């Protein structure tokens, strides 16, 4: 969440910045809650002062041997009033907390202003799209002859799922292993294995809850309906990785913390009805290698550029043409202050499609998680958190299938993946 002191000091300025994100801050509602909070706290202080004064009177009366029953009764009554005030304050504080959790992060001053993806700014293009001397086929047609099957997946589960068999399944696995090895050996990340099911506190910490519950898959525990707390399938490994530091105070010299994980991701794709219904671009279940960094606040934008470079390195090694864009204010994710999207060239679509999103969240997630470090003065201070795809495995497979397809229906395997494929250099159509 954003710093509440910013609202208390200059709420109109905050509202103006949020307007660039297409978010209308309810200034009147916040001011009303703040006024109620101040009134309760002021009356509480008055009651506490009155109780202290009366307590001193009781001591003086006892010293004189006089009757204290009336004053003690008054003190008891004040105690009841204080309990009622505390209960009222808890209710108001809960409303303020709920209000704060609904507010997206403030965009960094360097982020271009825009209402949607049309306002995004291209930073660079890397690699030249290949020229084909035969009719280009999309990954669905190429993959069908190599063991990619959507019909069987639909029978097993439903739409937006896939089954892979044989060489294409191995290629999918090879991509994930290659990404992990690159991030750990070359980029300094620690590989992690995390739960694929998380609690609501974890999702609130990274910003998916309470606002985006419709995008999640909730888990119903067999035979335990109604028992315990709600659990959810992870929409990204960002959630468990980032929550490793929830409710922690880490040593300043332990920063930066770099973590990576390969996991399945599960998304309901609410609001995506009718979009990318063909193929693997938008599925309910997909694999991703995630990068997360927990850094000193002064280092987070340096880390953002570094992480973008780490994701780019994967694409360069695979020989896939791509571009980097800076998202505008109206197209950024809820928790981000600045985001770079990497888009890979898909020849069958004749366009670039997102394959990675790398974001700096500054202290937005850290405040929600109470994730802190000890600064040079030894005082706890919020860390900054960053996350990024390094990369989405399924979409990378799509890009390899389309960019490396051959006229005979085979797919040449990028050289960097040969060691992961047992030396296999080409996938050929299955008989």
From Swiss-Prot:
Binding locations of ATP: 267-269, 354-357
Keywords carried by this UniProt record: Aminoacyl-tRNA synthetase, ATP-binding, Cytoplasm, Ligase, Nucleotide-binding, Protein biosynthesis
Reactions the enzyme catalyzes: tRNA(Ser) + L-serine + ATP = L-seryl-tRNA(Ser) + AMP + diphosphate + H(+); tRNA(Sec) + L-serine + ATP = L-seryl-tRNA(Sec) + AMP + diphosphate + H(+)
NCBIfam families (UniProt xref): serS
Description of its domains: Consists of two distinct domains, a catalytic core and a N-terminal extension that is involved in tRNA binding.
Protein task: Catalyzes the attachment of serine to tRNA(Ser). Is also able to aminoacylate tRNA(Sec) with serine, to form the misacylated tRNA L-seryl-tRNA(Sec), which will be further converted into selenocysteinyl-tRNA(Sec).
This protein's name: Serine--tRNA ligase
Taxonomic source organism: Janthinobacterium sp. (strain Marseille) (Minibacterium massiliensis)
